[in-house]
């Protein structure tokens, strides 16, 4: 076997060769651009945080407004001079406060009444007056003030990113701050150097939310060096992997070709043998794929041939079992007619010979529907001789339907079943209605015979699923199994019947094997 250089050696050389130059380039660019990148990242982070904080506060404001709107009617029924109503009001307001993702305090003030959840008597001047609402109660109108002491998002931003939050009014008076360097009530005067900030409008009162950061604390020599080294390392790894990946793509092109051939083999479209472009160990795998594909194709063809033979044998066996049942009854009729009416007996023999010629035709299992209908008419004619013309056959079909191709002997069992199980002392009317719909032939066979009881109908329906060679009831069972063999599960046979009301059989025959419409 020819010795080939391992891929890992080539990838290693590629990794070293492609990272020497990037080392110098990254160091130079990294040192120069570090500060700009850092500033850009911080500005981007602050912008993101101010948007998130604004969204969180707007969401809280909307929830509070929705809650108050929904409970306006409830508040109007409460009398705050009543101790129980005061308790109910506190419970509802606490529910409102606890539903919000922030530390909130409320003050409800009115005539001779003051309610709050500020049990620790915290100074509300250090909080942000978030919203005010007028609430109508049964006895008077009260003013509800809601203060924000803090929010989880602002605390998280302060803890993780060391970015602080301010809320100022339209005149830059500080209304809220979570940094001790700012005093509530004073003017906000942003620093020009060493600080980054981003602001956004908070409400209709022109209050603004400001997120700022003091970057003096982060610019230190040790941290700068670590960041630069980390950036250099990351870039080196990225460049190294890119280089190795490019080399791997060139070296693994034959592997991709083999994978593609496996895909073609899976879908049976591999074609003739084609060697790989590069002479390597992979050629042995390539040879094995073609050998395995050829063996698999031979096995598939053998299985398909065996399945076709099995279907042919089953169809022949079913057709063979149809004939003795009918021949026995017809021969008895001919024997009876030879004595009474030799001419009529001759007619029956001619009709029987035509039917046998049709049913024993072996060159094809399919016929035109018109031929099948002629066969049925001859069949009914012979049965009428036996039963004194008591059977009336009506066929309703378009000319297009009559020229469709179906399996041989696919309709005769339906008529045989109607005569055998529907005939009574009175005349029997049988109607065959044939329609075409969505590449399916729909056959409806309806008779006015004695019908079946519900228990008998259930038994007949269950017998359709019995194996064709295991049941003694050959009529509809044979037809159903024959349809399953010839058309697969796309064929459908449904039986409906009531005692003394006749029987209806609905039969769907696919005109295309690819049709799966039900």
Swiss-Prot record:
Alphabetical keyword list: ATP-binding, Cell membrane, Kinase, Membrane, Nucleotide-binding, Phosphoprotein, Transferase, Transmembrane, Transmembrane helix, Two-component regulatory system
Intracellular or extracellular location(s): Cell membrane
TM stretches of this protein: 20-40, 222-242
GO function terms (MF aspect): ATP binding; phosphorelay sensor kinase activity
Histidine kinase domain location: 297-513
The reaction(s) this protein catalyses: ATP + protein L-histidine = ADP + protein N-phospho-L-histidine
Record's GO cellular component terms: plasma membrane
Chain positions with Phosphohistidine modification: 325
Xref: InterPro entries: Bact_2-comp_sensor_kinase, HATPase_C_sf, Sig_transdc_His_kin_internal
Keyword Oxidoreductase attributed: no
Protein name as annotated: Sensor protein kinase HptS
Organism: Staphylococcus aureus (strain MRSA252)
């Amino acid at each position: 076997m020819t010795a080939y250089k391992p891929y890992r050696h080539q990838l290693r050389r590629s990794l070293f060769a492609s990272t020497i130059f990037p080392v110098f380039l990254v160091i130079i660019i990294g040192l120069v651009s570090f500060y700009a990148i850092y500033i850009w990242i911080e500005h981007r982070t602050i912008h993101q945080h101010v948007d998130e904080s604004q969204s969180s506060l707007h969401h809280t404001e909307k929830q509070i407004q929705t809650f108050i709107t929904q409970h306006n009617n409830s508040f109007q029924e409460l009398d705050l001079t009543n101790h129980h109503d005061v308790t109910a009001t506190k419970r509802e307001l606490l529910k409102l406060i606890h539903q919000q993702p922030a530390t909130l305090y409320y003050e409800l003030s009115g005539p001779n009444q003051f309610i709050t959840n500020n049990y620790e008597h915290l100074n509300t001047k250090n909080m942000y007056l978030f919203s005010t609402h007028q609430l109508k109660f049964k006895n008077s109108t009260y003013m509800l003030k809601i203060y924000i002491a803090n929010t989880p998002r602002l605390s998280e931003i302060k803890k993780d990113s060391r970015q602080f939050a301010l809320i100022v009014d339209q005149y830059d008076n500080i209304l809220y701050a979570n940094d001790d360097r700012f005093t509530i009530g004073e003017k906000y005067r942003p620093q020009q150097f060493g600080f980054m900030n981003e602001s956004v409008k908070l409400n209709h009162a022109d209050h603004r939310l400001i997120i700022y950061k003091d970057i003096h604390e982060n610019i230190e020599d040790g941290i700068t060096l670590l960041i630069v080294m980390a950036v250099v390392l990351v870039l080196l790894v990225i460049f190294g992997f890119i280089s190795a990946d490019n080399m791997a793509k060139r070296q693994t092109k034959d592997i991709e070709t083999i994978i593609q051939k496996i895909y073609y083999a899976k879908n049976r479209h591999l074609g003739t043998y084609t060697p790989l472009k590069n002479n390597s160990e992979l050629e042995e795998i390539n040879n094995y794929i073609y050998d395995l594909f050829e063996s698999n194709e031979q096995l598939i063809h053998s299985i398909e041939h065996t399945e076709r033979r099995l279907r042919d044998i089953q169809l022949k066996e079913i057709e063979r079992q149809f004939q003795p049942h009918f021949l026995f009854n017809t021969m008895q009729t001919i024997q009876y007619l030879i004595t009474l009416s030799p001419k009529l007996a001759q007619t029956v023999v001619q009709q029987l010979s035509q039917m046998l010629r049709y049913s024993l035709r072996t060159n094809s299992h399919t016929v035109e529907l018109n031929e099948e209908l002629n066969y049925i008419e001859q069949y009914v004619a012979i049965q009428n001789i036996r039963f004194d013309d008591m059977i009336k056959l009506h066929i309703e079909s378009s000319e297009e339907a009559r020229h469709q191709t179906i399996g041989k002997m696919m309709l005769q069992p339906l008529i045989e079943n109607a005569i055998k199980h529907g005939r009574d002392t009175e005349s029997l009317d049988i109607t065959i209605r044939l329609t075409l719909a969505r590449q399916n032939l729909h056959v409806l066979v309806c008779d006015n015979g004695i019908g079946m009881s519900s228990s008998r109908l259930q038994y007949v329906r269950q017998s359709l699923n019995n194996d064709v060679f295991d049941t003694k009831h050959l009529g509809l069972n044979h037809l159903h199994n024959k349809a399953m063999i010839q058309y697969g599960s796309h064929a459908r046979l449904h039986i409906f019947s009531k005692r003394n009301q006749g029987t209806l059989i609905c039969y769907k025959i696919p005109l295309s094997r690819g049709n799966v419409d039900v």
